[in-house]
A protein has these predicted regions:
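C-terminal cap/loop subdomain of S1 sulfatases and analogous C-terminal strand-loop tails that border
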Residues: 1-44, 48, 122
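Carboxylate-dense, calcium-coordinating segments in secreted/extracellular and ER-lumen proteins
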Residues: 54-58
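Long, internal low-complexity/basic segments
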Residues: 60-135
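Intrinsically disordered, low-complexity polar regions and short flexible loop motifs
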Residues: 51
């Protein structure tokens, strides 16, 4: 890597969800590791230049861009892990500790809220995705 830096930007978030994304060219790719009970898909891809509010997920249509994003994330991840004293990715640590900070202990109350607001249809999928949190 030169002193110029990379031609892409990697972002991680572990407060409300556990996601890592990469911004390159017109694309914003987001990989969801824990959806914070929001039923996000595992992968999302947005054309930020045409869709700055990230409303139109193109992941299923642009597998080429998703593949490039995954390659860039892997390159970044390998570089970061080599530079750390710890051999565990901090995002993995958050997940093994119970998930995103503000989602911990939240699923039962959230299900009550979903029922009260007419969105109870989402509860079976939440329980399927997060069985340990509902034990």
């Amino acid at each position: 890597m030169s002193n110029r830096g990379r031609d892409y930007l990697v972002l991680s978030q572990c407060a409300h969800v556990c996601q890592r994304g990469v911004r390159f060219g017109p694309w914003m790719y987001v990989r969801t590791h824990h959806d914070g009970y929001h039923l996000f898909p595992d992968e999302m891809l947005f054309d930020i230049e045409r869709d700055p509010h990230e409303q139109d997920d193109l992941a299923s249509d642009r597998l080429d861009a998703c593949g490039e994003a995954v390659r860039r994330l892997a390159e970044w991840h390998d570089s970061m892990m080599k530079s750390m004293d710890c051999d565990v990715d901090p995002l993995r640590t958050v997940i093994t500790e119970g998930g995103p900070t503000y989602a911990r202990g939240f699923p039962r109350r959230y299900c009550e809220r979903l029922e009260a607001t007419g969105r109870g249809w989402a509860i079976p999928e939440l329980k399927r995705r997060h069985p340990r949190e509902f034990e």
